[in-house]
Amino acid sequence: MTGVQTCALPISLIRLTGFNSATDDTLHQAIEKARNEIGRDLAGIIVDMRSNRGGLLDQAESVAEEFIGDGVIFSTQGRHPDSRRTYRSASRKTVTLPMVVLVNGNSASAAEIVAAALQDRGRAVIVGTTSYGKGTVQTVVRLPNEGELVLTWSRLLAPSGYTWNELGVLPNICTAKVADVDKLGLDSVEANRTTLMRWHAERNPTPDEVSNLRKICPPGEDSPDRDIEIASRLLRDPTLYAHAVRTGTVDQASAPRQ
């Protein structure tokens, strides 16, 4: 289910609670509604995917295409040659407004596809806590006895090549580490750069490595109201936003500069 509401103007808050067959269309309509109601004063968009457990893979691809004009969105990789595929955006009409995406420990699967793609491609700042870490694709094999076998077919990979399965997507800004939103500055934003680079460089982390990394921004330490406050603060300060979005990107050329 999807919905839209506006917080303190001129910022639009769009909530995505799942990825069903109508999600992309509903998102597109919500953005157009905000543009029509607010006009040129619209400073940016907050896409709230907290506790979004995912849904249809093709809808995750379509939602990402709303904001990524070309290049890799995500890829899948497994043992079978047919499981290896790269999903690229070929969209000619993309939304270019500044954007913040909210996630938490219950944001999973399709929501993580979108968050990882927008972060890697320098298209959005991710705010909140580390996401759930569901980064695999399953297929159902029907058995002769009318039973079913659920087979893990492939892993999902972000544009940078890391898999968030069990690891999760690490936010650009971890809510738990921001004590005073009014004092959020460039130093605070830049502090997470090295950690994000390490996170995105992981390919096959051990269980201990996963556990230690997830402790950096624990999923259970989210603060819903503070997430919105941080997102609003970023969108009202173009310089701060530009620095924040670049801390998580692997595509430096696509990230905004100030």
Q: What is the meaning of each model-derived region?
A:
Residues 8-258:
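C-terminal "post-core" interaction segments
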Residues 1-9:
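Short, small-residue-biased leader/transition segments that mark boundaries at the very start
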